[in-house]
Amino acid sequence: MKKQLLSALIGVSLLAPMAASAADYVIDTEGAHASITFKVNHLGYSYVVGRFNDFSGDFSYDAAKPTAMTVNVTVNTLSVDSNHAERDKHIRGEDFLNTGKFAKATFASTSVEDKGNGDLVINGNLTLNGVTKPLAIKAHAVGEGQDPWGGYRAGFTGTTTFAMKDFGIKMDLGPASSHVELDLVVEGVRK
């Protein structure tokens, strides 16, 4: 009896760390529960706002150990949509995204900082227009739990800003328009 109890306790103690381990999620783009939107100052007067309609990715997350989080995203840059066909054609061209040569942009996390209360800084490498540079995303864990269809979901928001010139974007729109602001909404479905 003591041997059985000891064996059971050892078995439970070996399984306990696995229960607290990170879960893998796929970003839910099919259900339109994720978005990548951008904003660029337009000549100091207003903003051009747009989005990327085609992207995919995954992440690994454990709320008990958020610093172990990993994120990988691929964006089809041809899917840029600023709600203006002629402008989108220009954005896809050599002055901006050069999609004829670089049809994909990627982000791969390298580390995560836990700032408390669900706030994170996700550090990683953004590859855009054939150039790879470090990028930090200020993120917030919105929540996680069971969905009505028997799955499990986790959601995050994020923001970041980068200088267009850092990624070899040739078009100079002036100092007021030199940076791109990204707003991210991510909902993942546990695999």
UniProtKB/Swiss-Prot annotation:
It is found in: Periplasm. It comes from the Bacteria. Keywords: Periplasm, Signal. GO terms for cellular component: periplasmic space. Residues 1-22 form the signal peptide. Its main location: periplasm. InterPro entries: Lipid/polyisoprenoid-bd_YceI, TTHA0802/YceI-like_sf, UPF0312/YceI. Coiled coil: none annotated. Belongs to the UPF0312 family. Type 1 subfamily. This is UPF0312 protein Sputcn32_2702.
